[in-house]
Amino acid sequence: MRHTLPIAPQFYVTAPQSCPYLEGRLERKLFTALQGEHAQKLNDTLSKQGFRRSQNVLYRPSCAECSACLSARIRVADFEPTRTQRRVMKRNADLRRNATSPWATEDQYALFRRYLDDRHADGGMADMDIFEFAAMIEETPIRSRVIEYSRPGDTPSNRPLSAVCLTDIFDDGLSMVYSFYDPDLAGRSLGAYVILDHIEIAREAGLPYVYLGYWVPGSRKMGYKATYSALEIYKGGRWQAIGQPSDHRAELHPLSVDPIAEQVARISLPEARSGDRSRD
């Protein structure tokens, strides 16, 4: 008979550093390695509990003074675009989508650099060189794709790259790990379009969710995520409709934080089948 054994990763906590979303706050992350034959199963399980992937690491914010970073996902079947979002889709109808293996290219990096220099020149990724960029794209132990969007050029074969998204494929959805786009095409609202197109990709694939990363009440950088209908957040150990964004201000209070040991104890882990067989 086959036995099931728990996949038991070790969890660690990062040292506090400045929060990129809320001024004057410190961030801290709970993380574990994502590797080995059970990486996909571990990723699928922990993503449902608010974890995100960065290369071969799974992490979840675990700050000492607040719990404002709430994992967010869109219910694909219930999503209804707003009038503005429909205009964004129409405006970008000429873009061509191309899903490729997670392999970095010089064109991608050139677009990435332009995006960072224009939008996040003082951010934590501002100094990434091409080798670090390649590692971000290529170091993935799970099913991942790079989704490229190109626009018409001077000739049919010349289609300039307009936007790129590194996307993970879960058993229940798509996770938008990182996206970037041409900063000179602000009128196209490419950031919004990439999200809308991922909803369509998930719909076509029969996947129920699109994971957007973290929504942070009180953060202007993350406020846009609340504009998408059928949005859920992971709060209090369960997924729930976001409701009114103002209802989640209490997550900024220090008393909203549980001790690290309690957080780890509540994490549900997947089981792995053992290859050993025994006779009754």
Swiss-Prot record:
Q: Which UniProt keywords apply?
A: Acyltransferase, Cytoplasm, Transferase
Record carries keyword Acyltransferase: yes
Q: Which SUPFAM superfamilies match?
A: Acyl-CoA N-acyltransferases (Nat) (SSF55729)
Q: Enumerate the GO terms in the molecular function aspect.
A: arginyl-tRNA--protein transferase activity; leucyl-tRNA--protein transferase activity
Question: GO CC: one term?
Answer: cytoplasm
Cell location: Cytoplasm
Catalytic function, reaction form: N-terminal L-glutamyl-[protein] + L-leucyl-tRNA(Leu) = N-terminal L-leucyl-L-glutamyl-[protein] + tRNA(Leu) + H(+); N-terminal L-aspartyl-[protein] + L-leucyl-tRNA(Leu) = N-terminal L-leucyl-L-aspartyl-[protein] + tRNA(Leu) + H(+)
According to the UniProt entry, what is the EC number of this protein?
A: 2.3.2.29
Key word Transmembrane helix present: no
Q: Broadest EC class? A: transferase
Family that this chain belongs to: Belongs to the R-transferase family. Bpt subfamily.
Its job:
Functions in the N-end rule pathway of protein degradation where it conjugates Leu from its aminoacyl-tRNA to the N-termini of proteins containing an N-terminal aspartate or glutamate.
The molecule here is called Aspartate/glutamate leucyltransferase
